[in-house]
Amino acid sequence: MTKFTTEEVRSKFITYFKANNHTHVPASSLIPDNDPSLMFVNSGMVQFKNVFTGQEKRSYNKAVTSQKSLRAGGKHNDLEHVGYTARHHTFFEMLGNFSFGDYFKEQAIYYTWDLLTKEFELPKDKLYVTIYHTDDPAASYWKKIAGLKDDRIIRIKTNDNFWSMGDTGPCGPCSEIFFDHGEEIYGGLPGTKDENCDRFIEIWNMVFMQYEQINKETRIELPKKSIDTGMGLERMTAVLQHVNNNYDIDLFQEIINFTENIVKIKVDGEAKFSYRVIADHLRASSFLIADGIIPSNEGRGYVLRRIMRRAMRHAHMLGAKEPLMYKLLPKLVDLMGNIYPELKIAESFISSILEQEEIRFKTTLERGLKLLTEETKTLTKGSKLSGEVAFKLYDTYGFPLDLTEDILKNRDITVDHKGFEELMLTQKERARKSWLGSGESKTDQLWFDIKEQYGSTEFLGYTLNEAECKIIALIKNNNLVDNIQEINTQFLLIANQTPFYGESGGQMGDIGMIFSQGSEIEVIDTFKYLRSIIVHKCILKKGKINIGENANLNINIRYRQNLRIHHSATHILHAVLHKILGKQVIQKGSLVTSTYLRFDINHSKAITNQEITLIEDQVNEIIRNNHEVTTTVMFTEDAIKQGAIALFGEKYDSEVRVVKIGETSLELCCGTHVKRTGDIGSFKIISESAIAAGVRRIEAVCGEFVIKLIRERDSLLKSIESSFKTNKNELITKVINILERNKELEKELEKAHLASLDLSIEQIKKQTKEITGIKLLYKEVGNINNKILRQAAENLTKKVENLIVVYIAHGVDKLSITVAVSKAITDKFNAGIIAKELSLFLGGSGGGGQASIAQAGGNDIINLTNINKKLWSLIVT
C-alpha cells in the first residue's frame, strides 16, 4: 500500500472527481452564510444545503470539495476530547463529492470503490461497508461493483445509517466504508459492542438522498435523487500513512516537531497530549481568525477564546514562559497556505490576535491556576469542585468551564455544573430583556393575553416596602404554568399588585424576597412589560408556588434606598447642569443603579475640571441644605406649563407624576426618590467622557459609595507613593521626571522605527510587486505614529521613480493608512484618492492629502484580510 502525504491525499481526491466531470468548488468560510441554526460549518454539505432543498440552483450538478470544518460547541462539541483521543479534532478537513439530481447510488458506490482501491491502493480485504438495514439496492451494488460477500456488508438498523436534515426535508439511507487496521488493534465490527474501538475506522460516508420527509408519518420518493459524501482528510491520511492516530500523520507531526524545537520538551508522556492539543487548536484558531472571528465573551468569539485559552494552558504546561502560538503560525501557513490562501493573506493579523490574547491571558492563567490548586488541595479522586469556585475562575480569571474541567480531568475531579450555571444565570440575566431570547414574538402575544385578562399591575412601592399580593401568573420558558416546585428554577411571577419597582425611566428594578405558604422565592430583577405589567424575575429557593396563592412581597430596603439616593441626585445634577452649562443642555439618557448613576447630555465640548468642581460643589450644597422632596400627580399639560422638565420624544400619559426637589428641580418622573436631599449624603463625579459627537456622559456616586471611593483612591495613592518610593508632596515631581524621560525614549523609538522602515533600492526591488511597470510596496506594521510612516514612505518614493508605498499600522482599536506615490507617476496615481478608497474599504470616513503623500484611518480590522485585492484593483484601474 503506497504511502501518501496529506497534500497528496487531498489533491488526488479532488483530481479524481474533476476527471469525472465534477466542478471543484472552493471551501466556504467556517461561518455559515445560509444556516442560522449552525454556529460553524461542520461538514462539506453545509454550503450546498439550499441546493439540496431546491431553494438554490447552481451552474453545475456535480461537485467536489475540500471543506474546512469545525466542531467545538453544541451538538458537535469535541473540545474536551481533542488531543487525548486518536481522531477528535476541533478543525478538520472534509473531502466530499456531491450529486444534485445527477448520478445516484450505483455510480456513487462505483466512484468510492474505484478511488479507494485503485487510486489509493487500499487492500480490498481490509474494507467493510455498512448500509441501512432495508437498503437492498445498496447491498446489490456493493456485491456487483466491489464483489463483497454478505459478511462484509453490515446492515445497521439504527439512525446511524439513516440521515435527515431535520423533522422534514430531504433524507435517506447511508452507507459507510470502514478500514480494518488489523487484529493487533482491539475493536469490533460496526454494530457490535466494541464498534467504537480503534480497529475498524470509518473513512467515508455516503448519504443517498432519495426521500422527502413530509411529516412524522409520511415520507415520499424524491423526483431527483442526490448524493452527499464525506471523507475526513486526517482519518484517510492516517490509514494511507499506516498509522492509527491522526496526530501521527505528517501535517500534525510537522507542527508538533516545530513546537518541540521551540519549547525543548520531549514529545512523550503527558507532554504528548499537550503537543497534540496545541497543534489542533493552532489550526482552529488561525482559520477562525482568518474568517473574521476575533476572541470575545459571546457567540463564536467565545468559542474561539475557549479554544485559544485551552491551547495556551497546554503551552504553559510545556513550560512556555512567553507567547507561543503566534510563533507556530508561520509553519501552519507554510503547510496549508497554498490550499487556503486566506491564511497567507491574514497571516500578520492572525499573528497579532494570537499574541495579544496570549499576553492578556498569561497573568490571569497563573493566578487562576494558583487559586485552583488552593481550592483542590483537600479534594480526592472522584470529588467535585464547587460551582462557586468554577464560576470565580470563569468570571475573575477568564477560565472557560471546559478549561477548568480539562485541568481537573487527570485527577478525576469533576465540577458542580448546576452551581456554576446558577451563578452564570444570576449574572447574565440581570439585564431586563435577556430572558426574551428567540421567543420574542411568541412572548409578546403571551403578555397581551395577560394584560387583557388581568389588566395593569398596581404599584405600591411609593409608600410600601412590603405588601400582601395575589399571584396571578407564573411563566417558565415563555409558557404559562400552574405552579413552580423545582428548587432553583428560574421563572417569572406576576401579582395583582406589588411594592417592587419595575425597571423604567432609567431606574433599575428592585430585588428582594417573596414568601407564600412555606415557600421562599428570591426576586433577582423586576421589569415592566407593555409599560404596565410589572414582572418579577424569580428563583424558587424553598417549597413551591401556585397560581392563585396569596404571597408576601418584600423589597430589599437597602438596595431600594441606594436607588432612591442616586435617582434624586440625578435630578439635582440635571438642574445644576442647566445653571452651569446653560439651559440648552438636554438629557440624552440616564441610568440609575444602586451603586452609581450615569447621565448623558448634549454638550459640544468636554466639561472642564473647573466646571466639574463647580457642579460637585453646588450639588453637595443642595444635599446639605436638606430640601424636601415632594411628588404630585398632575395633568401632563399643566406640569409642563409649570416648568416641569419632560424628556424630548418620551411618551407620557395624560396624567403624570411630578417630582419636586425644593426650589431646585421639577421633573416628570415615575421613579422612587428620597424624602429629603440630606438623605443622599454626598455626591462625587467619577468620570466625564464623550460617547458620541456632541454627547457627554457623566458618571457619579452618592452616599456610602463616595466614602468607598475616597478609601479606594487613598489606598491607591499610598500604593503609588510606595511604588515610587516617595510621598504625596514629591509625587508630582517624580512623575514629571518620568514623563520627561519617557519623551526622550519615545524620540529614540521614533528614530528606531524610521531606521527599520528605511530600505535600500535593492531591498525595495525584492519587497515590491510589479504590474504594468508600477512597483507596489505594501506593509502592515505595528503601532507606529503617522509622522514616522509619512517620512519613511516619502523617503522610499524618492529612491524609486515608479513606486507606490502603502503602510497600514495597527493601533489599539483602529488602523492607520499611509500612501506615498513617486512624483514621476502622480499624473497617473493620486495618493489622496488611494488613501480615501482604502479608508472607506476599512470602515473609515475617507482621508486625503497631496497627490504624492496622503494619510487616512479605518477601523474594520476584519476586512483587512481583503485589502490586497482592493489595493490592486485601485492600481490596475
UniProtKB/Swiss-Prot annotation:
Matching entries from NCBIfam families are given as: alaS (TIGR00344)
Can you tell me which family this protein belongs to?
Belongs to the class-II aminoacyl-tRNA synthetase family.
Q: What does this protein do?
A: Catalyzes the attachment of alanine to tRNA(Ala) in a two-step reaction: alanine is first activated by ATP to form Ala-AMP and then transferred to the acceptor end of tRNA(Ala). Also edits incorrectly charged Ser-tRNA(Ala) and Gly-tRNA(Ala) via its editing domain.
**Gene3D superfamilies per UniProt:** 2.40.30.130, 3.10.310.40, 3.30.54.20, Bira Bifunctional Protein, Domain 2, Threonyl-trna Synthetase, Chain A, domain 2
Requisite cofactors: Zn(2+)
Describe how the cofactor binds. Binds 1 zinc ion per subunit.
Q: What is its EC number?
A: 6.1.1.7
Q: Which gene encodes it?
A: alaS
Give, as one word, the top-level EC class: ligase
Q: Which InterPro entries match?
A: aa-tRNA-synth_II/BPL/LPL, Ala-tRNA-lgiase_IIc, Ala-tRNA-ligase_IIc_anticod-bd, Ala-tRNA-synth_IIc_core, Ala-tRNA-synth_IIc_N, Ala-tRNA_ligase, Ala_tRNA_ligase_euk/bac, DHHA1_dom
The UniProt annotation places Zn(2+) binding at: 567, 571, 669, 673
Keywords carried by this UniProt record: Aminoacyl-tRNA synthetase, ATP-binding, Cytoplasm, Ligase, Metal-binding, Nucleotide-binding, Protein biosynthesis, RNA-binding, tRNA-binding, Zinc
Name a single GO cellular component.
cytosol
Q: What is known of its domains?
A: Consists of three domains; the N-terminal catalytic domain, the editing domain and the C-terminal C-Ala domain. The editing domain removes incorrectly charged amino acids, while the C-Ala domain, along with tRNA(Ala), serves as a bridge to cooperatively bring together the editing and aminoacylation centers thus stimulating deacylation of misacylated tRNAs.
Principal localisation: cytoplasm
- From the Swiss-Prot or TrEMBL record, what is one GO molecular function term? ATP binding
Q: Which PANTHER family match?
A: ALANINE--TRNA LIGASE, CYTOPLASMIC, ALANYL-TRNA SYNTHETASE
Any one of the GO BP annotations: alanyl-tRNA aminoacylation
- Catalyzed chemical reaction(s): tRNA(Ala) + L-alanine + ATP = L-alanyl-tRNA(Ala) + AMP + diphosphate
Q: Where in the cell is it found?
A: Cytoplasm
Per its record, how is this protein called by name? Alanine--tRNA ligase
